[in-house]
């Protein structure tokens, strides 16, 4: 599972 923090880090 991908957490919100993980996603935002990839988006920058």
From Swiss-Prot:
Molecular-function GO terms, alphabetical: lipid binding
Keywords recorded for this protein, A-Z: Allergen, Lipid-binding, Transport
Keyword Nucleotidyltransferase: no
Protein family (similarity comment): Belongs to the plant LTP family.
Function: Plant non-specific lipid-transfer proteins transfer phospholipids as well as galactolipids across membranes. May play a role in wax or cutin deposition in the cell walls of expanding epidermal cells and certain secretory tissues.
Full protein name: Non-specific lipid-transfer protein
């Amino acid at each position: 599972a991908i957490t919100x923090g993980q996603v935002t880090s990839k988006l920058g």
